[in-house]
């Protein structure tokens, strides 16, 4: 698989993990401060990967547009 596909799969996996953490907390409440920190860390990693992936896609799109414009 391409690096982009791997990145997308990782982001989707992290999104699922974050959702599972939040569902558990919503069902039974917060067990400890450690649990809250784990959730915060998961959300932070997820948002960082989404941001990086977004920048990668944006730059790829810009390069593609530039390439298409120079060919015309």
Q: Where are each of the predicted segments found?
A:
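Amphipathic alpha-helical polymerization modules
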Residues: 2-72
């Amino acid at each position: 698989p391409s690096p982009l596909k791997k990145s997308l799969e990782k982001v989707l996996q992290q999104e699922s993990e974050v959702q599972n953490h939040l569902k558990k907390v919503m069902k039974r409440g917060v067990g400890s401060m450690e649990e809250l920190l784990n959730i915060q860390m998961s959300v932070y990693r997820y948002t960082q990967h989404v941001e990086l992936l977004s920048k990668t896609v944006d730059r790829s799109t810009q390069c593609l547009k530039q390439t298409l414009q120079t060919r015309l």
